[in-house]
Each structure stands twice: as structure tokens, then as C-alpha cells.
Amino acid sequence: MFILNNRKWRKLKRDPSAFFRDSKFNFLRYFSAKKFAKNFKNSSHIHKTNISKAQSNISSTLKENRKQDMLIPINFFNFEYIVKKLNNQNAIGVYILPSNLTLKPALCILESHKEDFLNKFLLTISSENLKLQYKFNGQIKNPKSVNEIWTDLFSIAHVDMKLSTDRTLSSSISQFWFRLEFCKEDKDFILFSTANRYSRKLWKHSIKNNQLFKEGIRNYSEISSLPYEEDHNFDIDLVFTWVNSEDKNWQELYKKYKPDFNSDATSTSRFLSRDELKFALRSWEMSGSFIRKIFIVSNCAPPAWLDLNNPKIQWVYHEEIMPQSALPTFSSHAIETSLHHIPGISNYFIYSNDDFLLTKPLNKDNFFYSNGIAKLRLEAWGNVNGECTEGEPDYLNGARNANTLLEKEFKKFTTKLHTHSPQSMRTDILFEMEKKYPEEFNRTLHNKFRSLDDIAVTGYLYHHYALLSGRALQSSDKTELVQQNHDFKKKLNNVVTLTKERNFDKLPLSVCINDGADSHLNEEWNVQVIKFLETLFPLPSSFEK
């Protein structure tokens, strides 16, 4: 796969014609459907007229592409892309998006529109230089001619299709599967060929006012003007906490306030930056586009590459959410007592560290139920018990202190930490806890480094408080933690392999590249982490200058 470095990317944005003239993408100027069209000369089939029409359309498109002299790269190649292109061709039908984006979406066409749709579909995949495969008689088929496609598709009611392209700059976004269905019409209803989450039988009197199956490729959920009960009609924001240990002002403050003793709470590896934030944002743009706004909480200057003019990005300094008496702070526990004070934040938000990276397509349902109940990803095993002890991990002591509050409130004991993964949070619950435990919040807020008497608000207290009060449930999503004391090379390579295979069932929801214990001094660890980040997320996001 051809990957653009920064110099080539700048050239592409500055002068696309020169880029394509000089680059490996030059082959796209000559539309590969020319060879494909040679195989379309099968005129003896019963659908001879329609096949000829398809061939004629493809030939015309080929000539038009030659006039344009190039096909532009595709930034995001997905089901939405093909729906948009089909709408440009005035195709007619409906589409159904699954609640879980790792499942296949469906494109549903009336039987009476089949011939017209197939002409427009073949024209679209030809003009876009896309490769078509589909499952037929239990095997994945690579059709060699329009005749073959028409013969196959006219004999079945539905088919799983795969579209792929060489026009993306990353192999992880170069293909997708969807289901093509042909619906039968009765005088009173339309019958879909397979069941779906809305309704398999669509009564015609229910579509009088919404023009479904009348114009364009429309979302099937438009059978009502109201949101569907499984859909989320609330905004979700994203919050990062970020620090740059190379920031000069931060370094001066750190030297001034750093205690004489060393611990994991003061280790510089905790504050090391490899531009993980850049890659985390790339992963969210690729896999979590449902996010409304991204808040980045920091006491450092924004990185030079970050585009603060992007309307989705808002930089939040500590003094905007924390009192002056608590500043400066170098404690994540302290910062996490105040995230719900971010101005303008939605009641529903996802809290993520910059070392948490998404690995597959996600939507709101991965983090919240449609009724607002949060989804937690607690570890499968318990780890929290006993009393706070000097010298033991600060995250564990923070959880122990939180556990004491939970036991008093709910008369139950808890033991499970949250996995190293994005956390589903609600500001109303955080405000409620702050009001209920003012002394513990205030004490943690004013500790400049993680301390023995901290409470872990987002690391422990929130999740179990929400769970025990009926406002959160455990999720079955898998996550991956990678540390230098693991077989990290094997773990990272496995994620890369599964991503290339688009094996969403086995891919974790996220992977955490977890620094600590002076991991920044481990050269092999640093090399493998950087290689992983650049391999999985090579393309700049819209959040970069």
C-alpha cells in the first residue's frame, strides 16, 4: 500500500495535478474498467438490452474519466460513500444501518427497480474504479462480466457484497461489506427479503408522507419523524487530558513542585509525549465520527500540529475548570475531579487518555444505551481490597479510598478496576458525587501529585457509583492493554494484522499503549510503539494543520 509522507501530503493538497502526474497514483488516470469492459461482450443473455446499456454507460464514463485525467484519492471509503454516489445517480431505495457498526449495513431495492438500480450500481462501481465481490452459493465470487453479475443477481433475493478500492491512502479503510436486498411489492405492503431492526413488512399507508422508495436512497428509519427507540437522540462529547513534558513552562513548574522522593506518580514516563494525541485523534476521526465536540484539558501549550480553528476542537486550560488554590497540579486524580466543570460539555461524554486508540468502527451504542445508561468496561477480575498503603500503586490506593465511600453508601463491596479504555461518563452523576463527597473531592483536587489520600473519581468511584445506582451496566466489549513488561511486539503486531484483515469480531474496541516505570528508557519499546502508531494511523486527520 502506497503511504504518503508529510512532504507528499503537502504536495497533494497544494497541487493535486502535479501529485498525480508524478506519483504512483498515476495509473489511476487510465480507468481500469477498460480491461473489465472487454469481458462484458456477452450479448446472448436474456437481459441483453440491459447488459448492453450497462456496457454503454461504462464506456461513456471511461471517456469522461480520461477527460478528467485522474481519479482523486478517497479519504473515507465506507457504506456512506457508495450511498452518496448512488444518490448522485438518482438510484431509488432505502438503507438500514446496524446498531453495531461492525455488522453489515443493508441496501434495499424494490424488485420492480432492480434493472434500473443494477445499471446505476454498475456505472457507479465502474466510474469509481471499485472492485466488486459477493457471496454466491457459499463462496466469495469475483465476477468477470456484466452478464455474470446480472445472471447472479436476478436469481437471488439478497446477497452480501464487498466493495474495495486502491484509491485510499490506508489499507484499513479500503473495503467494506454490505447486504443488497430486493424487496417484493404487494398491494398493501413492501416485504423485505430479510428481517431488520425496524420492520420486515412495510405497510404502504405508513410511507405516504416520507417518500420512501420514491426518490433517492433514504434511511429506512425515516418511516417516522421521531427518533427510533434504539437510536441516541443526545450529543456525546470526547474529553482528553494531555501533558507535554517538553513544554518549558511545564518543566519549570514541575521542578519547583516535585517532591524530593521518587515514585510512579512522579516518574517522567507518566508525562512523556510521542504525539500520541495526534494518533488518538486520527483514530477517533476514523472510527468515532459521532462525537460532537472534543475537549482537550491541559496546563501546556497546544501542540504545533493541532488546528485550533477546527470547530470540533476546544483547548481547555486547568484554570478554566479548577480553582487557583489547586494550581498548578501534576495529578491526574486532581484533574479528574473537575472534568464535569468544562464549559459547554454535554451531559454525556467519553473520557479518554491520549494513549487510548480506537481500532474499529464504533457508534454511540458502544458507550451508552439509547436511554442514557452508560456502558462500563470493568476488568474481568477483581483487584481492589485492603487498606491504603504507602509505596503501593497510587491508582490502587485511590480505588481503595473510593471503595470505602461506596461501601458506606450502598452496603456492598467492589473490587474491579475499569480497563485501560475510553470511559463513558455523565456530568449529572459527577456533580451528584461531588455534592455528596465534598471533602474527598476537595482534598484530591488540591494534591499536586497523586497521593495516599486521593479518591480515584474517574478511575473507580464513578463507575461503581453509576452501576450501583442503576445508571450504568457492564459491557462485553474487549479492550487491549500493552505495556513494556508484556510481549508487546506480539500484541501490537496482532492488532495490525486484525486491522488489515478487518476482523472486527476479534479486534478490541481500543488498545492502550501504557507507559510507566521508566518505559521511555526502553529503546525497543519506543521503536515498536512509534512503528505501530504510524502503521495503524498513517493519514493526517482534519484536526491537524
Curated annotation (Swiss-Prot):
UniProt xrefs under Pfam families: Stealth_CR1, Stealth_CR2, Stealth_CR3, Stealth_CR4
Root EC class: transferase
EC number: 2.7.-.-
Record carries keyword Endoplasmic reticulum: no
Keywords annotated in UniProt: Exopolysaccharide synthesis, Transferase
InterPro entries: Stealth, Stealth_CR1, Stealth_CR2, Stealth_CR3, Stealth_CR4
PANTHER family listed in its UniProt record: N-ACETYLGLUCOSAMINE-1-PHOSPHOTRANSFERASE SUBUNITS ALPHA_BETA, PTHR24045
Protein known as: Capsular polysaccharide phosphotransferase SacB
